[in-house]
Amino acid sequence: MSVLPPTLRENRRYVLFRIITLVNPTQKEVYRSMADSVSALFGDAGAAKMHPAVVWSEGEYAIARCTRGYEQSLIAALAVVTKVCGEPASFRSLATSGTILSLKKKVIPESIDDTTYPGYLCAGKKVNNLSKENGHRYLTRDDIIKE
């Protein structure tokens, strides 16, 4: 069987999302949670049209794939995930793109005290409205959640 030329292949879109949970789930566990959510929200026929898959997962970030035109449906399904591995969790979509590489470039690791933390690049967005600086800012989980 020969390979289809690029013009005949199905177009896909990729969604970068953040996994907010206390456990560190594997890519397969993230996929199971996403697939359950897609099936519950859109049924088996909707899931078959969408072709959801998790193609990359590292730390608290992951990239999901779907058929072009179903990006908003996938984002809605990601938003209703409540558990991963039986633990409370939520998925927050960050960006959508046509290539995996462009989404991976948005996840930049940052080292603080010889410890590497994943970070999300917010290029072109105003982070600090008081001083109107658009420089890159990196926040870790410890910066956001202060006990």
From Swiss-Prot:
EC number(s) reported in the record: 3.1.26.5
Main subcellular localisation: cytoplasm
Keywords tagged on the record: Cytoplasm, Endonuclease, Hydrolase, Nuclease, tRNA processing
Family matches, as InterPro entries: Pop5/Rpp14/Rnp2-like, Rnp2-like_sf
Subcellular location: Cytoplasm
MF-aspect GO terms: ribonuclease P activity
Catalytic activity: Endonucleolytic cleavage of RNA, removing 5'-extranucleotides from tRNA precursor
Domain of life the protein comes from: Archaea
GO terms, biological process: tRNA 5'-leader removal
Any GO CC annotation of this UniProt entry: ribonuclease P complex
Gene3D superfamilies: Ribonuclease P, Pop5 subunit
Signal sequence coordinates: none
One family name in Pfam for this protein: RNase_P_Rpp14
Complex and partners: Consists of a catalytic RNA component and at least 4-5 protein subunits.
Similarity comment: family membership: Belongs to the eukaryotic/archaeal RNase P protein component 2 family.
PANTHER family, per the entry: RIBONUCLEASE P PROTEIN SUBUNIT P14, RIBONUCLEASE P_MRP PROTEIN SUBUNIT POP5
Function: Part of ribonuclease P, a protein complex that generates mature tRNA molecules by cleaving their 5'-ends.
Protein name as it appears in the record: Ribonuclease P protein component 2
Native source organism of the sequence: Methanocorpusculum labreanum (strain ATCC 43576 / DSM 4855 / Z)
